[in-house]
């Protein structure tokens, strides 16, 4: 029985919850409704939770309130994608509810889950039932009722998991698209994985990391990032230190959590990877010898590597003196746009974007990524163009925590972003620009061509793995094995009698022959439509289209 949870136990709950989510990230990704090759939910929740875990591991406290603040900050700044932002808000409310406590009981644990739900619902403009929000809500409500009958946090957490699982299984009855595809909600599944890790920790158990067999001959490739380091003397830990230890039978038994905590005292940038035979370690430290001595407790040192990062930094400075490196532009009003593909970035720059953040379907930037750009620009005002529905909430979260006056234009595609930026008026106020840029989003129809990563049926369209898919906004309107056929079916749906301009943005995987045939088809079938073609260079999507 566990009647009280202190900071140490809560830290272990976070660590085990993060590990269980990490182990199941691919499974969560596989539940994504749309079979596009992004797999964002599991990936984004995992990266978000990992950010919270790392913050906790670097700032351990026996006081649960203090630890909660640390965890919440890590989640907030590391949040990626809508699922990651919602996860961060669930625990933001949870941690806010315990901030004045040194330890909590079952009743406060349940109330904190409920507080998290209330915070998350407020953070979402239009909450949708049948999602992670529903699973969190149902589990929290059940927890509050159960806490009246038990003081055992283990029993409470077991009940929460039962109710969360029941809620998860019911999500297809609340969201028609889940039932059509035959899956449960991916975000809800990710949250359940976190809760299951919590229970493991409460029971004194450990979630073992899923790892591939390690290569005994290679270290993890590491390129030192000296961004933000002005003087060599500012480098606190001067030696990039790596070691490989083969576990010994008569040596100390290896416990990954203990190993990580001990190693973190030697420096920063810690990376630990292990299997049954060896452990690989990467750490930046001032005393490599201490790292090696510690490693010998567990077995034989089979590979060692030390690099002097101060000397490397001096070399970087010497090279930079000969090669001018542009600094981040300081502006009054920063126009920050998320972009995927060099060509698309150049389009945004030519239209007046001051800062480009690389990101998109396969890697959503975190809240912190956006915050850093705003802060480093030293701007007074900021306009953020997410250009992806899954980056919208992280953008709004970033805008809410920076000192600059920041607004988010709700662009959900690259074409919408281009259309919005075209409306920017340098002489208008921030609010005027926000209104006219947001209004322009409604005047453009966006389309895209990509491929399917699995068999499914959605929006009434039968889809086969590796077939091409044509989408208008988020709706799949065509899917065929032939690329040109899929494109022409898509454009037939997009183009109307009053369509005037069709913009085509070509991706890095587009075939020239298909592009030529597509343009010829457009000119023959729609002679009154003006066609603009740009090289975008975007991955995943062979083409982006916009119709105005």
UniProtKB/Swiss-Prot annotation:
Pfam families associated with the record: Dak2 (PF02734), FakA-like_C (PF13684), FakA-like_M (PF21645)
Protein name: Uncharacterized protein SAB1090
Start and end residues of each DhaL domain: 8-200
InterPro entries: DegV_domain_contain (IPR050270), DhaL_dom (IPR004007), DhaL_dom_sf (IPR036117), FakA-like_C (IPR033470), FakA-like_M (IPR048394), YloV-like (IPR019986)
Highest rank taxon of the organism: Bacteria
PANTHER family given in the database record: DEGV DOMAIN-CONTAINING PROTEIN DR_1986-RELATED, PHOSPHATASE PROTEIN
Species the sequence originates in: Staphylococcus aureus (strain bovine RF122 / ET3-1)
GO molecular function term, any single one: glycerone kinase activity
Example GO BP: glycerol metabolic process
């Amino acid at each position: 029985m566990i009647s009280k949870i202190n900071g140490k136990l809560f830290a272990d709950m976070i660590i085990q919850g993060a590990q269980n989510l990490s182990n199941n990230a691919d499974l969560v990704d596989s539940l994504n409704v749309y079979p596009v090759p992004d797999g964002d939910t599991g990936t984004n929740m995992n990266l978000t939770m990992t950010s919270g875990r790392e913050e906790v591991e670097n700032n351990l406290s026996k006081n649960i309130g203090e630890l909660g603040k640390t965890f919440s900050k890590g989640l907030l700044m590391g949040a990626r994608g809508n699922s990651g932002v919602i996860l961060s808000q669930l625990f933001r409310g949870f941690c806010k509810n315990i901030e004045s406590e040194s330890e909590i009981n079952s009743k406060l644990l349940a109330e904190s889950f409920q507080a998290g739900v209330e915070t998350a619902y407020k953070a979402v403009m239009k909450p949708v039932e049948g999602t992670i929000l529903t699973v969190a809500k149902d589990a929290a409500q059940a927890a509050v009722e159960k806490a009246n009958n038990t003081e055992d946090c283990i029993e409470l957490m077991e009940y929460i998991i039962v109710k969360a699982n029941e809620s998860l299984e019911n999500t297809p009855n609340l969201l028609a698209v889940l039932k059509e595809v035959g899956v449960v909600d991916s975000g809800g599944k990710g949250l359940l994985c976190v809760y299951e890790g919590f229970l493991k920790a409460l029971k004194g158990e450990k979630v073992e990391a899923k790892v591939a067999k390690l290569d005994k001959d290679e270290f993890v490739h590491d390129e030192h990032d000296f961004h933000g380091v002005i003087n060599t003397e500012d480098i606190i830990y001067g030696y990039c230190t790596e070691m490989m230890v083969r576990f010994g039978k008569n040596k100390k038994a290896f416990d990954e959590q203990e190993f990580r905590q001990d190693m973190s005292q030697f420096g920063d940038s810690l990376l630990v990877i292990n299997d049954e035979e060896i452990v690989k370690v990467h750490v930046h430290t001032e005393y490599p010898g201490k790292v090696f001595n510690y490693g010998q407790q567990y077995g034989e040192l089979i590979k060692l590597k030390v690099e002097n990062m101060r000397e490397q930094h001096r070399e970087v400075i010497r090279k930079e003196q000969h090669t001018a490196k542009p600094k981040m532009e300081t502006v009054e009003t920063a126009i920050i746009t998320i972009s995927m593909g060099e060509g698309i970035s150049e389009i945004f720059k030519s239209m007046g974007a001051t800062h480009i953040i690389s990101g998109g379907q396969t890697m959503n930037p975190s809240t912190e990524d956006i915050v850093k750009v705003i802060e480093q620009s030293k701007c007074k005002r900021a306009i953020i163009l997410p250009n992806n529905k899954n980056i919208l909430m992280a953008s709004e979260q970033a805008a809410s925590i920076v000192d600059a006056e920041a607004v988010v234009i709700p662009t959900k595609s690259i074409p919408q972003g281009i259309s919005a930026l075209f409306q920017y008026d340098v002489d208008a106020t921030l609010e005027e620009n926000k209104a006219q840029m947001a209004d322009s989003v409604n005047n453009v129809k966006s389309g895209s061509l990509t491929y399917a990563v699995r068999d499914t049926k959605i929006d009434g369209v039968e889809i086969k793995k590796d077939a091409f898919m044509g989408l208008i906004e988020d709706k799949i309107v065509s899917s065929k094995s032939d690329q040109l056929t899929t494109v022409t079916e898509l454009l037939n749906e997009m183009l109307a009698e009053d369509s005037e301009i069709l913009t085509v943005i070509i991706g890095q995987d587009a075939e020239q022959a298909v592009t030529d045939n597509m343009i010829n088809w457009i000119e023959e079938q729609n002679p009154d439509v003006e066609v603009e073609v740009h090289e975008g260079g975007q991955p995943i999507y062979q083409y982006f289209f916009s119709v105005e």
